[in-house]
């Protein structure tokens, strides 16, 4: 039995003791600095991180230098002490931080280890610099009244990490204990307690309550802080008042969301920019938020984050734009789309897919072989089970999770499908522990009757638990069986070779893939078209890696050589051929946890953060950064994302699920339309897909069999109080032609993962092509393995060419009709047409419902 947290409680307490001792050597314990110094330091903050003796000091420095608050990470051997006003620090340390300026971490010896500090809030002369103020463990991005509550995201109690129910119970107990301890601390405050003690105790309680969704209780805790600050004439109190106002604004805005967007949900709620139908009707949370944000901006008018939140809050109460003071207003013209591909309406509610939950993964695929695409969903909440929604074929979905045997599969931030045993039934791989603590993964075998069996241990994928966010299933040795590469956080990533008998062997060392990093995404693709699938690894805080498959079970790292090692703080990634030239290109997003970049973009201000990257394949397996050329040099904090063809022109578009853990990170998810491989255009506003809630697992799929890609987005954040309904955006249709293909491998893996498709067209006498690499798409969200390919208008399909994994020559099909579904079996001549009945999502067709082959009642 592996104990997640076993033996760590005492160690964690020891680290806390050392950290507090180290902090006390750097903090002013009295008002010994001259008042002029305190005044000059008003609004200036540093972040402090305590690193154990022999801990990863350089690792921490690199992350801080990139502008990320360390409270967002759980790095072994390091502990964030949060944001500390410069006025509270030792004079020499504060002076040194001021001298070097933001973005330059300073290392100082400390009792039991090392203290790493970095200036966050700039001095007045530096107010134009970006401040990364998002703290995952606090209500808002700025307030730092107490040591971080990041421990709420990890397990600090002994528990068997392979026992999912035990992990759930341990999490609940940990949170309950934290709330009890925080209440006790506030109740124990003596009359006239020093201001720092009052703020620390109430902020601890408020943060814990907000984590659970008790916004009213959290607001009361922060109001207690605000009342004390208003009554205290000291410079220290004046310096903290803005933070209290911001926290209260954020908490009240979230209270308004819970009362309206969650409890009284409609299809336009939280879609940015907000329409009249999205206005809050219940409670006064948003109105209170407007008042707090306005008062804050009177104190600190340069804060772009609060300025953005004020505009959003005003939209929710119907006073935008006129009700926002002109100097704080972000005008409506800033949000307009340059093009209009049509409105995608959210039909998740009537379709039966408006699950309310936290962040999680998504798979859209056919799990019962009936020709209708189903939806599988996971949740970061360790007590929430895996959900399977069966497509009834009438516009609605049925929750068959219990019947499928999935209720014991608790938690899991990400999902991906596979067919590891080549039986033709879609299996599920669940990844757990990402951003969190080591919890086991699960391989779920599809039994072919809409039930699943956990075969993780039997298959050889059990053993030690890890923090896992991403995995790539591919046939790396071309033996016809899908292998799996699993990317872990801070432990050795692993390559497992499929033996072909339902079991796997760890070949990581043999393959030359032994590395350790904070790996957030892994994807497979053949970058040099040599017939061997290569591997790209997206790391958070370190360079990204491209492993070239040399054949014979060996890989060579060539990321820098091929030009794809950036960005430094990356997340979701994928291979796709965005310009249809037959070579795989690469997109990598950044996870910059700041709200400030959003108003910067809309106001036309510089965005100093890292942009996403699009790397164009030069046709030899090396890449060129074409991000600015494509109009994508934007800083968009992204988590889940995927690609699809929203207008059936055959060029792949994409959707970014935005956000970060903080309740403050309300920003629209973004849709980008591909302009024939030459540029990408933001069509978020015109398509109506700019959801403000945090976006995670994303899938493009033709869920209604009408010949175009619909969009499913798993919505919700990391905290228990940040749950939200998922969204299903129905494609309005564009009248263009298309073809859907299901490939069945015989010598290749049966799911045909890693096959190349080329559709050769005659467009007005000119031969063109549309290409697809068979995959589920991005690393956070899985689209169907059946390939839907848009063919534009007026084209004639001349032939279909298929390069099967491991095959020497392509399989060629002719006589394929447009606007059809076909099945192609490797090595068999011709193809099999498949009939499909179209239907309207969310509107059951009269007389057209069908009984389930497994359960007529479904």
Residue positions per predicted region:
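Short coil/linker segments at helix-helix boundaries
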Residues: 165, 224-242, 250-295, 320-340
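Hydrophobic beta-strand segments that make up the repeating blades of beta-propeller
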Residues: 362, 372-379, 424, 428-433, ...
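Gly/Ser/Thr/Pro-enriched helix-cap/hinge segments flanking short amphipathic alpha-helices
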Residues: 630, 679-681, 685-694, 699, ...
């Amino acid at each position: 039995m592996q104990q997640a947290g076993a033996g760590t409680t005492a160690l964690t307490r020891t680290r806390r003791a050392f950290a507090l001792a180290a902090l006390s050597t750097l903090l002013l314990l009295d008002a010994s600095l001259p008042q002029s110094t305190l005044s000059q330091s008003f609004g200036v903050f540093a972040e402090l991180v305590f690193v154990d003796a022999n801990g990863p000091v350089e690792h921490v420095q690199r992350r801080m230098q990139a502008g990320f608050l360390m409270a967002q990470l759980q790095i072994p051997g390091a502990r964030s002490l949060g944001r500390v006003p410069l006025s509270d620090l030792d004079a020499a340390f504060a002076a040194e931080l001021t001298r070097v300026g933001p973005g330059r971490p300073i290392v100082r010896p400390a009792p039991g280890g090392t203290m790493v500090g970095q200036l966050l809030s700039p001095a007045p002369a530096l107010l134009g610099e970006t401040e990364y103020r998002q703290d995952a463990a606090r209500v808002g991005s700025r307030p730092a009244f107490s040591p971080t509550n990041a421990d709420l995201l990890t397990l600090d109690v002994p528990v068997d990490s392979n026992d999912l129910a035990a992990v759930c119970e341990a999490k609940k107990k940990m949170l309950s204990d934290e709330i009890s301890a925080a209440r006790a601390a506030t109740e124990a405050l003596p009359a006239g307690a020093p201001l720092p003690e009052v703020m620390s105790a109430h902020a601890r309680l408020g943060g814990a309550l907000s984590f659970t969704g008790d916004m009213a209780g959290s607001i009361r805790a922060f109001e207690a802080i605000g009342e004390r600050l208003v009554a205290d004439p000291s410079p220290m109190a004046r310096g903290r008042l803005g933070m209290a106002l911001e926290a209260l604004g954020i908490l009240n805005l979230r209270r308004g969301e819970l009362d309206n967007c969650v409890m009284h949900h409609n299809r336009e709620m939280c879609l940015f920019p907000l329409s009249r139908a999205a206005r809050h009707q219940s409670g006064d949370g948003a109105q209170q938020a407007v008042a707090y944000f306005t008062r804050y901006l009177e104190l600190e008018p340069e804060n772009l984050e609060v300025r953005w939140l004020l505009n959003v809050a005003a939209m929710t109460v119907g006073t935008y734009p006129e009700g926002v003071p002109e100097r704080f207003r972000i005008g409506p013209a800033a949000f307009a789309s340059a093009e209009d591909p049509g409105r995608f309406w959210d039909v998740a509610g009537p379709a039966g897919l408006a699950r309310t939950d936290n962040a999680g993964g998504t798979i859209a695929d056919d799990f019962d072989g009936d020709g209708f695409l189903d939806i599988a969903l996971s949740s970061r909440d360790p007590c929430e089970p895996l959900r399977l929604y069966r497509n009834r074929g009438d516009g609605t979905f049925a929750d068959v999770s219990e019947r499928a045997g999935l209720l014991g599969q608790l938690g899991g931030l990400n999902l991906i499908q596979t067919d590891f045993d080549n039986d033709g039934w879609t299996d599920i791989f669940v990844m757990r522990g990402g951003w969190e603590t080591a919890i086991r993964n699960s391989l779920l075998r599809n039994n072919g009757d809409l039930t699943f069996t956990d075969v993780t241990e039997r298959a050889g994928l059990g053993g030690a638990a890890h923090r896992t966010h991403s995995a790539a299933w591919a046939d790396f040795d071309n033996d016809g069986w899908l292998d799996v590469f699993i990317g872990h956080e801070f432990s050795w990533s692993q390559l497992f070779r499929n033996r072909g008998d339902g079991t796997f062997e760890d070949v990581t060392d043999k393959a030359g893939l032994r590395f350790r990093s904070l790996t957030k995404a892994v994807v497979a693709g053949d970058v040099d078209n040599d017939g061997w699938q290569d591997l790209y690894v997206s790391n958070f805080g370190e360079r990204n890696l491209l492993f070239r498959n040399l054949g014979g079970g060996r890989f060579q790292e060539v990321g820098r050589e091929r030009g794809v090692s950036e960005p430094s703080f990356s997340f979701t990634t994928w291979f796709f051929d965005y310009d249809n030239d037959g070579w795989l290109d690469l997109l990598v997003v950044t996870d910059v946890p700041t709200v400030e970049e959003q108003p910067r973009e809309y106001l036309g201000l510089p965005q100093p953060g890292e942009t996403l990257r699009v790397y164009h394949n030069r046709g030899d397996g090396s890449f060129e950064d074409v991000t600015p050329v494509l109009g994508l040099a934007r800083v968009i904090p992204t988590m889940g994302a995927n690609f699809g063809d929203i207008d059936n022109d055959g060029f792949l578009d994409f959707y970014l699920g935005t956000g970060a853990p903080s309740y403050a990170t309300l920003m629209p998810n973004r849709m980008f339309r591909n302009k024939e491989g030459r540029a990408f255009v933001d069509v978020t506003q015109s398509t109506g897909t700019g959801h403000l809630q945090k976006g995670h697992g994303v899938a493009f799929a033709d869920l209604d069999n009408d010949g175009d890609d619909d969009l499913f987005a798993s919505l919700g954040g990391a905290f228990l109080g940040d749950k939200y309904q998922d969204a299903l955006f129905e494609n309005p249709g564009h009248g263009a032609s298309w073809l859907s293909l299901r490939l069945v491998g015989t010598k290749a893996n049966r799911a045909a993962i890693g096959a190349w498709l080329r559709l050769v067209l005659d467009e007005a006498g000119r031969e063109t092509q549309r290409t697809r690499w068979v995959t589920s798409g991005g690393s956070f969200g899985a689209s169907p393995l059946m390939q839907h390919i848009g063919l534009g208008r007026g084209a004639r399909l001349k032939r279909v060419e298929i390069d099967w994994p491991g095959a020497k020559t392509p399989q060629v099909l002719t006589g394929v009709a447009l606007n059809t579904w076909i099945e192609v079996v490797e090595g068999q001549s011709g193809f099999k047409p498949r009939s499909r009945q179209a239907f309207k999502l969310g509107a059951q067709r009269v007389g057209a419902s069908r009984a389930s082959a497994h359960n007529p009642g479904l």
